[in-house]
């Protein structure tokens, strides 16, 4: 999964695998969206309201709602309830579960490297829009 180099300070990530970089580029639009996905994946047994997600992730309600809708639109989570009170739940999908698991592990162990990759992708998207 993650290529590691061993040093005096312990394991240091050399770089994220290309498959993980590609998954981030294709599927992850922000750090808070990744945290939302990981949070729901870590708690698949129940549905969550946007208010609950925002509280657990120390995010604004607006950001939580935006991330939840984006993840729903891409098929990572389902939505039950009403338009006024939606509830979201992680959907296990065999074709992406291993990528999400690898990304969650990388984010837990090599947070700065994953965040750097997300910002690299965001900056490239922004530059392409302005050209």
Indicate where each model-derived feature is located.
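Long, charge-rich, low-complexity intrinsically disordered regions
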Residues: 2-3, 7-10, 89-93, 116, ...
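Short alpha-helical segments that sit at the start of domains
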Residues: 7-35
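Short, cationic-aromatic polyanion-contact patches
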Residues: 27-32, 81-105
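A short acidic, leucine-rich amphipathic alpha-helix
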Residues: 36, 49-55
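Short amphipathic alpha-helical interaction segments
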Residues: 58-74
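Amphipathic alpha-helical dimerization/coiled-coil segments
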Residues: 98-131
